[in-house]
């Protein structure tokens, strides 16, 4: 577990430093003035497209190199046998991952350095876009199981004292949005939902019999303390292991 936390600590430092660089250069600054599209909200279409990230106009290749080196050094990812991939290949991989709406790193997939690093390169761009757009999105206008900013699937949830909704955390841009209290955000099935609380009662594992997916949740019904949800996602990795051992799917 300590090894996992150490890896993500280094990864986040790399990504956050690059995001700070993007912010300083005013990359994606135009999104501050971009209107929230009500038609997209009504149709369930995310506000940001891949082209909106304008990756061609920024030095992301340095970020890719740092992430790839970290993956090769600290994970089971193997260094590619041939020369470094061309920028066009990396962008194509990033586009495919963005369009698929899946988490930036897939679970249960072969350890492919190029694809894994290409996905992780997206994080600073998506997080920066989320910071510009999410505060201006009317939560009551969005009732979907995917993120209104980038279209990502949720990786975590928070159960509040309010009986009608919970908060979902995007697995890609760290955006947070409201979703109904009951029902699966992945397949939208309202029935066949079960949750298993941890011994402490602080967390719940929601599972959907219809699509076999699971979602970790933090029970905040009796607490109003501030919690960092991306950190909560990492600190509950034992729940992921237990769920997958039982055959439940992350996505």
Question: What spans do the regions from the language model cover?
Answer:
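Short, charged low-complexity linear segments at domain edges
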Residues: 114-132, 139-167, 178-193
């Amino acid at each position: 577990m300590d090894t996992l936390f150490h890896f993500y600590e280094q990864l986040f430092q790399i990504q956050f430093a690059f995001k700070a660089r993007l912010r300083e250069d005013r990359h994606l600054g135009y999104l501050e003035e971009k209107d929230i599209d009500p038609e997209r909200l009504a149709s369930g279409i995310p506000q940001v497209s891949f082209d909106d990230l304008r990756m061609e106009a920024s030095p992301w290749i340095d970020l890719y190199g740092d992430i790839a080196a970290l993956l090769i050094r600290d994970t089971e990812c193997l260094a590619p046998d041939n020369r470094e991939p061309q920028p066009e290949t990396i962008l194509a991989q990033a586009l495919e991952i963005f369009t698929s709406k899946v988490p930036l790193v897939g679970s249960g997939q072969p350890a492919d350095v190029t694809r894994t690093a290409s996905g992780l390169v997206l994080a600073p761009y998506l997080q920066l876009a989320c910071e510009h757009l999410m505060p201006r999105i009317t939560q009551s206008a969005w009732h979907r199981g995917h993120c209104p900013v980038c279209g990502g699937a949720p990786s975590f949830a928070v159960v509040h004292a309010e009986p009608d909704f919970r908060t979902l955390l995007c697995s890609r841009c760290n955006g947070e949005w409201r979703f109904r209290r009951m029902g699966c955000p992945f397949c939208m099935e309202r029935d066949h939902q079960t949750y298993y609380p941890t011994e402490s009662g602080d967390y719940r594992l929601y599972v959907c019999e219809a699509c076999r997916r699971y979602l970790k949740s933090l029970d905040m019904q009796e607490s109003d303390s501030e919690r960092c949800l991306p950190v909560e996602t990492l600190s509950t990795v034992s729940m992921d292991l237990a769920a997958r051992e039982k055959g439940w799917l992350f996505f």
